[in-house]
Amino acid sequence: MSSVIASRRYAYAFLSAAEAGGFLETVTGEMQMVGETLAASRDLQRALASPLINADRKTHLLEEIFAEAVGDKMMLFLRLIAHKKRAGILGGITQEFAALLDEKNGIVNAAVTSATELSDSQQKALSRSLEGYTGKKVRSAMKIDESLIGGLSVKIGDTIFDGSVRHQLQLLREKLVAVEA
């Protein structure tokens, strides 16, 4: 089983259990903190993924790092992950948990790239427009790329809306080349 599939299954199972048990709000913040801790430490990632370190040592490592910072339910989940020899995919589980939670809450992520910085009113108008298009709440991550020349490009999931001047010029170039041929 691929690590992405396994990560999604563990995340889904934990999300479902947390929702049914009424502790989803508590573990959401804890899961985010675990993910941030993993993302900040390559050494921790390597240790959890290492086949040379046994499950008991990984459990002990997770307990040392997180016992004071997370509640009983989250600690039980971390122990389970280590016991099942899935500690190496813990980072993926935290990402999948966040994605499933966003999906449950009707939130989509949009990567917005613009040629210049957008004003607050432009960002709000863009978000409203994207929310109207998707029917979901949009969380935008803004990035500036001057090579776009003007306009912007938006990526939501697998869909890209490219309204940049660079893209329009590229399309025009392709049409001109096709006419000449």
Curated annotation (Swiss-Prot):
GO terms for cellular component: plasma membrane; proton-transporting ATP synthase complex. It is found in: Cell inner membrane. Keywords: ATP synthesis, Cell inner membrane, Cell membrane, CF(1), Hydrogen ion transport, Ion transport, Membrane, Transport. It is a peripheral membrane protein. InterPro entries: ATP_synth_OSCP/delta_N_sf (IPR026015), ATPase_OSCP/dsu (IPR000711). Gene3D superfamilies: N-terminal domain of the delta subunit of the F1F0-ATP synthase. One of its GO terms (molecular function) is proton-transporting ATP synthase activity, rotational mechanism. PANTHER family: ATP SYNTHASE DELTA CHAIN (PTHR11910). Belongs to the ATPase delta chain family. NCBIfam families: ATP_synt_delta. F-type ATPases have 2 components, F(1) - the catalytic core - and F(0) - the membrane proton channel. F(1) has five subunits: alpha(3), beta(3), gamma(1), delta(1), epsilon(1). F(0) has three main subunits: a(1), b(2) and c(10-14). The alpha and beta chains form an alternating ring which encloses part of the gamma chain. F(1) is attached to F(0) by a central stalk formed by the gamma and epsilon chains, while a peripheral stalk is formed by the delta and b chains. HAMAP family: ATP_synth_delta_bact. F(1)F(0) ATP synthase produces ATP from ADP in the presence of a proton or sodium gradient. F-type ATPases consist of two structural domains, F(1) containing the extramembraneous catalytic core and F(0) containing the membrane proton channel, linked together by a central stalk and a peripheral stalk. During catalysis, ATP synthesis in the catalytic domain of F(1) is coupled via a rotary mechanism of the central stalk subunits to proton translocation. This protein is part of the stalk that links CF(0) to CF(1). It either transmits conformational changes from CF(0) to CF(1) or is implicated in proton conduction. This is ATP synthase subunit delta.
